[in-house]
C-alpha cells in the first residue's frame, strides 16, 4: 500500500527519525542539569554560578523562537533542517573543546539558536510526513522522543559525564546528531514551507483568551518546576548528603516516571484533560513542599521523584495538546510562542534556583518553587472553570 508516492514504511521512518531528532534536541537542553557539579569543578566555579548557563540557554530560545520562525517561514524545510543541524553539531564540538566557561556559554547559545528553529517547525513537519490518517500518532511519537530525553537522555548523559567527563557527553550528543542528520538527508523529500503563519497570525492568537490563559499557566508552572529541578543534582549531593551515583539513579527514576505520566494522559487525556492537569499541578505543589523533608533518606526521595515525574509529564502533555487544539490555523506560530514561553519558565526557574542557592540556601529550592506552583494551581482552577469544555471535545 502506498501513500501519495511513498510507502507507509518510509513515511513512518521519516517520522521516527524526526522523533529521534526531538530526543537529541531535548537531551542537550536537559543534560546540563545532571552535569552542573562536574562542569563547576572543571572550571573552579560554584555549582550555582554554572547554573546560570541554564537560564541563558532557555531565554535565548524564548527570545529567538518567534523571530527565527518568521525569518525562515519561506525557506524549504529540508534545507532548513540541514542548516540547523550543522549549527547544532558545530556548537557541540565547541562545547567539547571549551577552554573556559565563556566559550561553553557561547557554544550553548549556538545550540539554543538551532533549538529555537527546530521546535517551531517540528509539530507541523510531523503532521506533513505522517501516513494518511495517522497525524495524531505522529505527534505522539514526537512527544515520546521528548519524554525519552528525560527518561534516558539525561541519565545516560550524566553517566557518560561521570565516567568519561562532561565534555564527552556533549561530543556524543553531537555525533548522535550527525548520524540523525545523515538519515534525514537520505529520507526526507523537499518540503516547501506550508501554513507556517506570519506576523498577521499573532493578533488572531492574542485575541483568544483561552490560549493566552494557557500560556500564562505554562510559564508559571514551568518556573515552579525548574526552580527545584534545575538544582536537583547538587541538592541530592550537598543538601541530602547522598552519593553522586544516587543522584544519577534519582534522575532516572524521575524521568522514568514520565512514561507513567504519558500513559495516564494517553488513557484519560481526551476526556479529562483539564482535570488531569489540575490534579498534576496539585501533585507538583505537594512534591515541592516535601522535597526537603524527603531528603532524609534515599527511599523517600525516590518515592517523591516518581510522583514528581508523573506530574510534570501530564502537565507538559496537557499544555501542548491544548495549545495545538486552540490554534490549528497557525500551528507553527502557536508552537513557536509555546516553546518561547516554556523556555521563559525554564530560564526563570533556573534563575530563581540560582539566586536562592547563592544568597539563601539550596535546601529552600523546593519551598520557593512551591510558591509559583500554588499560584499555577489557583490559575488552572479559574481558567478551567471559565472554559469548562475540554479542548479535545470542541468541534474542529
Swiss-Prot record:
- The encoding gene is sotB
What UniProt keywords are attached to this protein's entry? Cell inner membrane, Cell membrane, Membrane, Sugar transport, Transmembrane, Transmembrane helix, Transport
Which stretches are Periplasmic in the membrane topology?
Answer: 36-49, 102, 157-168, 230-245, 296-300, 354-363
Question: Where are its TM segments located?
Answer: 15-35, 50-70, 81-101, 103-123, 136-156, 169-189, 209-229, 246-266, 275-295, 301-321, 333-353, 364-384
What is known about what this protein does? Involved in the efflux of sugars. The physiological role may be the reduction of the intracellular concentration of toxic sugars or sugar metabolites.
GO MF assignments: carbohydrate transmembrane transporter activity
What is the membrane topology listed in the Swiss-Prot or TrEMBL record?
A: Multi-pass membrane protein
Protein name listed in UniProt: Probable sugar efflux transporter
> Lineage in the entry?
Bacteria, Pseudomonadati, Pseudomonadota, Gammaproteobacteria, Enterobacterales
Amino acid at each position: 500500500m502506498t501513500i501519495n508516492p511513498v510507502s507507509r514504511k518510509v513515511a513512518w521512518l521519516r517520522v521516527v527519525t524526526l522523533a529521534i531528532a526531538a530526543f537529541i534536541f531535548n537531551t542537550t537542553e536537559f543534560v546540563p542539569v545532571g552535569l552542573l557539579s562536574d562542569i563547576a569543578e572543571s572550571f573552579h566555579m560554584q555549582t550555582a554560578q554554572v547554573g546560570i548557563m541554564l537560564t541563558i540557554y532557555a531565554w535565548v530560545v524564548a527570545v529567538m523562537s518567534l523571530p527565527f520562525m518568521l525569518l525562515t517561514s519561506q525557506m524549504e524545510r529540508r534545507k532548513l533542517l540541514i542548516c540547523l543541524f550543522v549549527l547544532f553539531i558545530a556548537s557541540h564540538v565547541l562545547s567539547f573543546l571549551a577552554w573556559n566557561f565563556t566559550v561553553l556559554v557561547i557554544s550553548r547559545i549556538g545550540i539554543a539558536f538551532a533549538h529555537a528553529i527546530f521546535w517551531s517547525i517540528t509539530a507541523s513537519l510531523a503532521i506533513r510526513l505522517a501516513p494518511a490518517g495517522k497525524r495524531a500518532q505522529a505527534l505522539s511519537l514526537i512527544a515520546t522522543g521528548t519524554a525519552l530525553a528525560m527518561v534516558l537522555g539525561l541519565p545516560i548523559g550524566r553517566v557518560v559525564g561521570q565516567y568519561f567527563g562532561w565534555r564527552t557527553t556533549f561530543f556524543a550528543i553531537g555525533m548522535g546528531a550527525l548520524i540523525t542528520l545523515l538519515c534525514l538527508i537520505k529520507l526526507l523529500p523537499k518540503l516547501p514551507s506550508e501554513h507556517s503563519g506570519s506576523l498577521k497570525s499573532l493578533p488572531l492568537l492574542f485575541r483568544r483568551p483561552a490560549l493566552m490563559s494557557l500560556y500564562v499557566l505554562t510559564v508559571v508552572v514551568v518556573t515552579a518546576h525548574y526552580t527545584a529541578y534545575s538544582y536537583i543534582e547538587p541538592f541530592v549531593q550537598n543538601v541530602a548528603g547522598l552519593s553522586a551515583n544516587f543522584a544519577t539513579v534519582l534522575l532516572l527514576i524521575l524521568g522514568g516516571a514520565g512514561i507513567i505520566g504519558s500513559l495516564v494522559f494517553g488513557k484519560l487525556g481526551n476526556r479529562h484533560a483539564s482535570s488531569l492537569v489540575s490534579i498534576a499541578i496539585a501533585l507538583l505543589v505537594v512534591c515541592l513542599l516535601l522535597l526537603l523533608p524527603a531528603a532524609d533518606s534515599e527511599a523517600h526521595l525516590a518515592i517523591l521523584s516518581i510522583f514528581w515525574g508523573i506530574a510534570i509529564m501530564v502537565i507538559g502533555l496537557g499544555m501542548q495538546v491544548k495549545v495545538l487544539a486552540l490554534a490549528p490555523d497557525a500551528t507553527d506560530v502557536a508552537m513557536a510562542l509555546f516553546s518561547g514561553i516554556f523556555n521563559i519558565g525554564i530560564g526563570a526557574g533556573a534563575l530563581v534556583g540560582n539566586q536562592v542557592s547563592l544568597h539563601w540556601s539550596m535546601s529552600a529550592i523546593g519551598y520557593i518553587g512551591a510558591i509559583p506552583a500554588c499560584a499555577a494551581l489557583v490559575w488552572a482552577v479559574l481558567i478551567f472553570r471559565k472554559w469548562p469544555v475540554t479542548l479535545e471535545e470542541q468541534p474542529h
